[in-house]
Amino acid sequence: MAPIRSRSRKVRIGTQMINEIIKKIEELSGQYSGYEIFSDWIKAAALCIDNLAGNYNQEIYRKREAQYMEIAKKHLGKMGDFADMTGMLTISLEDNMEDVLGKIYMQAGLGNKQTGQFFTPFHLSYLTAKIAVPEDVNEQTPYIMHEPSTGGGGMIIAAAKVLRDRGLNYQKCLKVVAQDLDWKGVYMTYVQLSLLGIEATVIQGDSLSGQDTAAEQIFYTPRKKGLII
């Protein structure tokens, strides 16, 4: 019975963290909408993780540092709240491996017809991943995953969870290239994959255009850089 109690406890903690983040978004809303608070929080988290993990292109480092400072000036006195929210996100991902940001986005009512952005319920992503991920994956023959419309990274997280549930170390058995036209989806994917230790290249752009990708449109997770956070 002990494993059942432990699993239940973890789900409760993960859910609690999600509820706390949604509450924090509502508290910070006022001058800016909840949608804008969410978007700026995720962007700030992505910029911070990327630069702290070591951005070896100094021009890109400076540009992302400037973007982060713009957010800090816009939300003066709130960056500590953003950091707390990132901490709660980390706890939720550790306790209940799923598309936490997609769930927050939908439960907070940020997805609507105006924005045109919705996120697939994670249980559906997981069922799809169970079919899609090959049975012969291992550290010597990792699963190479290309996600041309990543959203918040839900399908990638689902694939990682399938590997974990098979008793494999997904941090060594999964390599990802994820892309999305929407910057928010890029930031959401990058933050969650970084916190989960997934090796990934996350790109902003149209996967069907065939155009070259500029350096500032590419994010490498810490794991891709050889680090674990």
Give the ranges of each region predicted by the language model:
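A generic, residue-level signal for flexible/boundary positions that often mark functional hotspots
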Residues: 112-113, 175, 189
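Residues at the starts of beta-strands that form the adenosine-phosphate
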Residues: 144, 173-175
